[in-house]
From Swiss-Prot:
Naturally occurring in which organism (per UniProt): Lacticaseibacillus casei (Lactobacillus casei)
Lineage: Bacteria, Bacillati, Bacillota, Bacilli, Lactobacillales
Annotated GO biological process: DNA repair
Family annotation (InterPro entries): HAD-like_hydrolase_sf, HAD-like_sf, HAD-SF_hydro_IA, HAD_2, HAD_sf, PGP-like_dom2
Cellular component per GO, a single term: cytosol
Assigned protein family: Belongs to the HAD-like hydrolase superfamily. CbbY/CbbZ/Gph/YieH family.
Any GO molecular function: phosphoglycolate phosphatase activity
Protein name, per record: Uncharacterized protein in fgs 3'region
Coiled coil: none
Amino acid sequence: MTATVIFDLDGTLVNTEALYLKSNVKAAAVLGLHRTEADFRPLVGSAGPSEAKIIADLVGADHAAWFQQFSTQDVLDQIRSGADFVLPGADKTLQTLDQMGYRLALATSSAKHYVDVVLAATGWVKRFDPILTGSDVTAHKPDPEIYHVMKTKLPETPAIVVEDTHVGVAAAEGAGLPVVMIPGIGQGPDHKATAILAAAITDLPDWLQNHPTFA
């Protein structure tokens, strides 16, 4: 019986959130606004109305759409230019889990065109199956829709989610899936998670091996 490990992307496997903070500051500067990375840190792990409100408060509602487009394009430019953004141990962990016989899936709120660039840059295009992005659902995390859809694409075998934010943990739990949290930027431990690995993603294979009930 092949168990599936479903990964979030940003902040869990890749440090694009750090790239985004830099791009956010740059976008604000283009608008003539002095903002710091700390100002934009509340955006990490946010989505939907809460994200929109944070952006509107920081750069103005009239500039919100442009701000998001500029920031995303700047991040993609950094990635295409060879920015080092894979989190330490992520690639090794994926290889180890694959060798252990786990099926690897991806569930991210990011748009498909963005995910395609990230996966091409990391060499992970064929690493995950299935892959679900924000372009495949109508509601983003913390809404559990993406994980409900993921469950329909997986055989009736055990599955566990790996997330880095409270928003992601809530989405997985809302779909009835166990979730391991590896806290990301500005994220304290979420004790609603099945487990919290505060040290590193490289601890995940051993944790899974020691907890066969979940995967």
